[in-house]
């Protein structure tokens, strides 16, 4: 998605060979016009999957997920990292997930009231790195007896093993921007890497 790639190039900051900072438009300050376009693109990509619910993890996944759910005209559910006092702890689906950015585990939960066996669920997240967050959400969806209709990722770090992990389990993945490298404080996209390799040969 060129609009997203342009935002990454102009407004993203490479902090290390493994960390891209995008808090100017995605996970702190939110560019609502860009999120709207991202939501519409996910809705277009998964239009044939008969999605009934969109699921994400709080909090950075909420903005793109909301726009996607709005475009699909279906409810959005966000898994909580901390149990609410209003949530019956005996009436939840839960999974333990590891955050690549925060270097810590979280127990994420979804109320059993909102996921049903007949649901076809689209999982949306802001980043795909090692695939642990998305895997945790697939476990919750499947524990509910629902079906994972697909996984939509805003920014994928293709140099990490998240895609291989999820595709190995048979899930459909659509990423709007795939980054092949952050080496040298420069963002390199998968398509650009392939083009460079072709030209070199």
From Swiss-Prot:
GO molecular-function terms, A-Z: xanthine phosphoribosyltransferase activity
Binding-site list for 5-phospho-alpha-D-ribose 1-diphosphate:
129-133
Residue positions binding xanthine:
20, 27, 157
Give the principal location in a single coarse category. Answer: cytoplasm
* A single cellular component GO annotation: cytoplasm
| Location of this chain's protein in the cell | Cytoplasm
Q: Which GO terms describe its biological process?
A: purine ribonucleoside salvage; xanthine metabolic process; XMP salvage
Name the Pfam families on file. Pribosyltran (PF00156)
Keywords, alphabetical: Cytoplasm, Glycosyltransferase, Purine salvage, Transferase
Q: What class of enzyme is it?
A: transferase
Q: Which Gene3D superfamilies match?
A: 3.40.50.2020
Pathway assigned in UniProt: Purine metabolism; XMP biosynthesis via salvage pathway; XMP from xanthine: step 1/1
What EC number is given for this enzyme? 2.4.2.22
Q: Which chemical reaction does it catalyze?
A: XMP + diphosphate = xanthine + 5-phospho-alpha-D-ribose 1-diphosphate
Job description of the protein: Converts the preformed base xanthine, a product of nucleic acid breakdown, to xanthosine 5'-monophosphate (XMP), so it can be reused for RNA or DNA synthesis.
Name the protein family. Answer: Belongs to the purine/pyrimidine phosphoribosyltransferase family. Xpt subfamily.
> How does this polypeptide assemble, per the annotation?
Homodimer.
What is this protein called in UniProt? Answer: Xanthine phosphoribosyltransferase
Its taxonomic placement starts with:
Bacteria, Bacillati, Bacillota, Bacilli, Bacillales
Q: Write the gene name.
A: xpt
